[in-house]
A protein has these predicted regions:
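Short beta-strand-to-loop acidic/aromatic patch adjacent to the donor-nucleotide binding site
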Residues: 108-120
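Short beta-strand/loop segment that forms part of the nucleotide-sugar
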Residues: 36-51, 86-88
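Active-site acidic Asp-centered loop
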Residues: 47, 115-118, 148
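Conserved catalytic core of nucleotide-sugar-dependent glycosyltransferases
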Residues: 122-224
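Active-site-proximal specificity loops/subdomain of glycosyltransferases
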Residues: 50-109
Length: 289
């Protein structure tokens, strides 16, 4: 790879049961790269201002040790990737972390990728993004990029839906069909869609529209002012989208229509070991961070 990347992920302590799947998908995307031009960033947040740990079933120190064990294999890959981890005790949200991540690495790398604990990163991620950046960096050094997503709840998301998903029906509360927003997909299932791709289907999405999971932005766009406003605590992707439209409304958003990124929003283990939250039927009803 000729392009330098950074990919960053905030892990809340109660997400410890799902982050391994994200790490496995990330490892898969790195195993066959020719060099180690990827910085892998993690912040493991142990702050309990919003959610308290149920110490009758888990201890915070144990979760920290588990996280360190999960991340360790990334440091031992043949290419010896630059893995940067920290344990955070202060109050932060995803907006705080992503704002810092974009600002911190925009002067060190060419392209930034937003990871997420409930995401599965396509194994083609860095290969296709490297190809894209090398082709467009002279003519459009400031750009956004996105991957195909599952079937969404209204037609405003159709430009982002994966080609195999977009013509499927949206069924409210559906957890059984593979295209559904509530379906929890495995890495192997994701690979079945992506491994069959022979020719990339790339379009320019206008106006900009994206969610934060797997969102890609060139460092030149960040350095020009596209970042999450400091007054934003949640809904960071919407805020970042507004800033992109305000600051650089004409930059392209290159969208890979036939490369699937998985966002397991309703993963059954997304919120574990939280005091007083033993039976959460609908995650977002009680989600605070």
């Amino acid at each position: 790879m000729k392009t330098k990347f950074a990919i960053g992920c905030l892990v809340q302590w109660y997400e410890i049961e799902i982050v391994q799947e994200y790490i496995d998908s990330l490892k898969q995307s790195l195993e066959h790269q020719e060099n180690n031009n990827v910085i892998i960033d993690f912040t493991f947040n142990i702050n309990q201002q919003l959610e308290k740990i149920d110490e009758s079933v888990a201890k915070l120190d144990e979760l920290v040790d588990r996280f360190k064990t999960m991340v360790s294999p990334l440091k031992k890959l043949v290419k010896k990737y630059d893995v940067r981890c920290r344990i955070n005790e202060d109050f932060i949200t995803i907006a705080h972390y992503r704002r810092w991540f974009l600002d911190e690495y925009c002067t060190e790398v060419d392209v930034l990728v937003q990871g997420e604990t409930d995401a599965l990163i396509p194994k083609q991620t860095f290969t296709v993004l490297d190809m894209l950046h090398q082709q467009v960096k002279k003519d459009t050094p400031k750009y956004l990029a996105t991957f195909g997503i599952n079937k969404m709840w209204d037609d405003s998301w159709k430009p982002l839906e994966h080609v195999d998903f977009t013509n499927k029906p949206f069924i409210n509360d559906d957890e059984d069909n593979w295209w559904s927003i509530r379906y929890t997909m495995t890495i192997d299932e994701m690979n079945q869609f992506n491994d069959k791709v022979e020719d990339l289907d790339i379009v320019n999405v206008k106006p900009h529209k994206f969610n934060g999971c797997g969102f890609v932005i060139s460092s030149e766009a960040v350095k020009s002012g596209v970042n999450i406003p400091k007054g934003t605590f949640f809904i960071d992707d919407t805020a970042l989208g507004h800033m992109a439209q305000k600051v650089l409304p004409d930059i392209p958003q290159y969208h890979f229509r036939n490369i699937l990124i998985v966002h397991n929003r309703k993963h059954s283990k997304k919120r574990s070991w939280i005091l007083g939250e033993n039976d959460v039927n609908y995650i977002d009803d009680k989600r605070k961070s």
